[in-house]
Amino acid sequence: MGLFDKIFGSYSDREVKRITPIVDKIDSLGPEMEKLSDEELKQKTFEFKDRYAKGESLDDMLPEAFAVCREASTRVLGMKHYREQLIGGTVLHQGRIAEMKTGEGKTLVATLPVYLNAIAGKGVHVITVNDYLATRDKEWMGQLYEFLGLTTGVIVHGLTNDQRREAYNADITYGTNNEFGFDYLRDNMVIYKEERVQRPLHYCIVDEVDSILIDEARTPLIISGAGSKSTDLYKIADFFVKKLREEEDYTIDEKAHAAMLTDKGVAEAEKAFGIENYADANNMELQHHITQALKANYVMKRDKDYMVKDDEIAIVDEFTGRLMEGRRYSDGLHQAIEAKEGVKVQRESKTLATITFQNYFRMYTKLAGMTGTALTEETEFREIYGLDVVVIPTHRPVQREDHSDLVFKTAKGKYDAIVEEIIETHKTGQPVLVGTTSIEKSEYLSSLLKKKGVPHKVLNARYHEQEAEIVSHAGELGNITIATNMAGRGTDIKLGEGVLEVGGLKIIGTERHESRRIDNQLRGRSGRQGDKGHSRFYISLEDDLMRIFGSEKLQSVVDRLGLEETEAIESKMVTKSIENAQKKVEGNNFDIRKTLLGYDDVMNKQREVIYKQRSQVLEGENLEDSVQAMIEDVVTSAVQAHLGNIDEDDFEKELGDLIKYLEDIMLPHGKFTVEELKTSSNEEITRKFIECAREIYKEKEEFVGSEQMREIERVIILRVVDTKWMDHIDDMDHLKQGIGLRAYKQQDPTQAYQMEGSAMFDEMINNIKIDTVRYLFHVKVEAEKPQRERVAKETGASHGGDSQEVKKKPVKKEPKVGRNDLCPCGSGKKYKSCCGREVV
């Protein structure tokens, strides 16, 4: 704590002081609320809604609404909010992060701002880390909301669209970040507005906010369809890298989590694949496959980064140890790991829609979060999300003793000492929770305990199903639980009978995590609600953190002391050195996330433009003027491209090419000739082409009817936009993969990505116009009463958020035309190259 904080109190102290008068006001309303009958208490909700509709702000209603919620909670749940919980609720309503220690009742705290903000009638979302917690909290707290006249819903995996829509239309909706994010993406892929399930994003409270907004920030949500590329090259690249020798043919950079070929390795690749220059742009695909094969074989570790389960590769969440079901590494890394492990290599998928959690959650009008550990990441929360962190005081003083770290020379010495400590503690009956950083290490420690005949339970990704059950018993007398990192987070560890008498729950950390926050979370499992407890971390100089980021100074101290394998040192200097190593890694990880956000912000602005225009089309905006403007733009830009600034000698050739080009898109074959137009000015040519195209379009509309034509325009525009957007996502991804090399040319990669990405976006918009006009002029429909289903079918449009791409072909009510026959439209081209071409 700095001198300023000692004199004036910390930022959180000052904020809590500021909120105290509001809490006093809530307290003073208590007796008044106690006098109300159940029905009168419920009527308060409708009174608040009426006052809100008349212009009273939620801030003004806060003391009264919180007092109503507090009284209802006492009656329905038998739980009355403490003053500290009222402070936490106020912080959450203000759109901030409330740091509340484990066991301080975060679930109950959230009911206050959730109730108040639900009064606005715009929907409140409560985000949890898994389906189990979402369902539990909805059922538990739903009793309170329903008593107060509000509706609740829960979004879990496997619901139908109608069930999802119903849940989102409730006043309060619980669910996981994945479900909310995927629903947003799917809503922006539908053909009919009635198929959307979400309402506009209004107010959101994220439980375990650090886990979702920071730990998962680097993992984008992706909806994908099957790709078409062969998987053979992954197997060939894997076969090649398995023969390479470390240091000689490749090197590993543990800090960057990457592996690279040496000059000798490059020569080996050129020889093996029969190429002259490995670095040549033509060999980019090969470079990519070899790079991913190197990373898969020599950087990614089985049972730490991923597991092989049912002949498939399952990603292990590095922070929780849980399996990330349904998630795959992007950029071909997943396929490279599949090749390494000898399981079936799945085809690389095509991205249909994608968004990062960073950008999804920044779309809410108001965002708030709660967690036991946020202060260490305060800078990131403020810079990325505009959220500040307020530490809420605990209801009872923390009595847990956090002991200094013990540092050993070797990992073996460390594990021997841990086993010894567990055995000694077990004799007293004190329960022990041991935190490890990987499945591999938890199982290694388990094997050591088995050899000594010590009974214990192991909790990691392999036993995900029993997670909550095992964790809930971890505080019972004599229990020993080994857990991978934060597995079981969200489930309280309550102390069993007689445990306080033997010192409460003992926490043993088997090594320091890269992030201090994860260490604090482990410590926080003990000492809830003022209970006694103990915690200590055991560290060796062979641990990843110490080996990669630890200081040489610490190593030299250990060497000078001449420590034996079983001896440990314990000092403030050592702890400081370890914290500095962690700060270094945290800073490094923050920079990576910030850089990725810089790239994603470019895509985000483009996504917003596309989704906004898409929404306007869905909402029924009259598209007639837009289509006419597209026709004009396509003709004008084509004339400019062919006839602008050219030599007189080339004029007739370019004019002929222009006519052919526009005949392919919209003009009737043979209507215009070079002879007829060669004396006309560019402006005159443009005018004639536009007039002709408009005339043809008008005739088409008169034939099918205006209402049917507007519907056809809507479906075709949506599908062309979707197709081009999907291709653009791929193109931007490829651009990002190679953009890092710009640094060698003294260019800022982010700036280069922004400029080139912007040019690619403009090109995509232009191509959308061209394809939309082409399909509108080529589509053949019969005149009859418009039917949305039929129009969608005829233009090849699919319903809903289908993750597979849809092939669209114009429907013709004529005898079937062979793909190699001349096209009946009169263009002179083969049917497959003209009206029979596929839209996607």
Swiss-Prot record:
List the PROSITE patterns hit by this protein, alphabetically. Answer: SECA, SECA_MOTOR_DEAD
Positions that bind Zn(2+): 823, 825, 834-835
- What GO annotations for molecular function exist for this entry? ATP binding; metal ion binding; protein-exporting ATPase activity
> What keywords appear on the UniProt entry?
ATP-binding, Cell membrane, Cytoplasm, Membrane, Metal-binding, Nucleotide-binding, Protein transport, Translocase, Translocation, Transport, Zinc
For activity, the cofactor(s) needed are: Zn(2+)
Lineage: superkingdom? Bacteria
Q: Which SUPFAM superfamilies match?
A: Helical scaffold and wing domains of SecA (SSF81886), P-loop containing nucleoside triphosphate hydrolases (SSF52540), Pre-protein crosslinking domain of SecA (SSF81767)
Where does this protein chiefly localize? membrane
Q: Which reaction does it catalyse?
A: ATP + H2O + cellular proteinSide 1 = ADP + phosphate + cellular proteinSide 2
The UniProt entry, under InterPro entries, shows: Helicase_ATP-bd (IPR014001), Helicase_C-like (IPR001650), P-loop_NTPase (IPR027417), SEC_C_motif (IPR004027), SecA (IPR000185), SecA_CS (IPR020937), SecA_DEAD (IPR011115), SecA_motor_DEAD (IPR014018)
- What topology in the membrane does the UniProt record assign? Peripheral membrane protein
- The annotated region (Disordered) lies at 787-822
Q: How does it assemble?
A: Monomer and homodimer. Part of the essential Sec protein translocation apparatus which comprises SecA, SecYEG and auxiliary proteins SecDF. Other proteins may also be involved.
Q: Which family does it belong to?
A: Belongs to the SecA family.
Q: What is this protein called?
A: Protein translocase subunit SecA
Instruction: Name its species.
Output: Clostridium perfringens (strain ATCC 13124 / DSM 756 / JCM 1290 / NCIMB 6125 / NCTC 8237 / Type A)
